[in-house]
């Protein structure tokens, strides 16, 4: 599975679509951004190919010169989904005793989304959410 940031050209209008590539290509998991309260980020692209959203506002990340910075963008959200897919792949290998196909892994990812009270064009299937065991 290829995971891509949905893009930061959003204008806050969920009916005004912004497409960014490679996120808008078929078979790419397109990830939008939400803040810590699960509210879609104003800059996050809205369109018909968003697959899911993840935290992407005020994310502490590495920065040049061995420092850290608070960054915002769908590029901060996409790694959350990549990490979630890695955990699901590890888990599914144990549960199913075989390696899942990309489509099966995607279906497992979507099972771990929580639908938010916003249009599908800004959240796709919802917020990626894994409960700790």
Over which residues does each language-model region extend?
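Residue-level recognition of conserved structural "scaffold" positions that shape functional pockets
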Residues: 14, 80, 90, 131-133
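Caspase-like cysteine protease fold
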Residues: 119-133
